[in-house]
A protein has these predicted regions:
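Signature of N-terminal electron-transfer/Fe-S-associated modules in redox systems
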Residues: 1-164
């Protein structure tokens, strides 16, 4: 119940969990506040400080790093802030590196609020960030034209080397 209530509290507080919300959850569940705090600080999906209207999470786990996640991080540093978790002056956007978001097959990728942006490179990432900073909603999904997680280059099997 703690994780679900933390998730709800985060949704109700502009994507972060204030201390008052954690204390309320502890009281509601009749458990020590420190236990709620332990859960909130253990999982990276909970934000304990304001993150902005647009919260960009760049996966930097091994599959994404091998495929160029460092270029996505460079784009975030150029467009949003040199430092992770630092809000833009208008408080509209922040970014951070995160552990696996579960879209390894379409690496490298990032999540902005609830949407996944996959098969990215630096140029595509910069364009997406430009759009969100203008208040626009870029199209989520693959930026190589793949549908879901279909193979690239029309490969049908692992042995299909001619299309590799």
């Amino acid at each position: 119940a703690v994780m679900s209530l933390l998730y709800i509290a985060q949704r109700q507080n502009n994507n972060w969990i204030p201390l008052a919300a954690m204390k309320y959850i502890a009281k509601f569940l009749d458990m020590p506040y420190i236990k709620v705090y332990e859960v909130a600080t253990f999982y990276t999906m909970y934000n304990l400080s304001p993150v902005g209207k647009f919260f960009v999470q760049v996966c930097t786990t091994t599959p994404c790093m091998i495929r160029g996640a460092n270029k996505l991080v460079e784009a975030c540093k150029e467009k949003i802030s040199e430092n992770e978790s630092e809000l833009l002056s208008d408080k509209d956007c922040s970014w951070m590196e995160v552990e696996c978001l579960g879209a390894c097959v379409n690496a490298p990728m990032m999540q902005i609020n609830d949407d996944y942006y996959e098969d990215l490179d630096k140029e595509k990432t910069l364009k997406i960030l430009d759009k969100i900073l203008k208040g626009e909603n870029p199209k989520p999904g693959s930026y190589r034209g793949r549908v879901n997680n279909e193979p690239e280059n029309s490969r049908k099997t692992l042995m299909d080397l001619k299309n590799a």
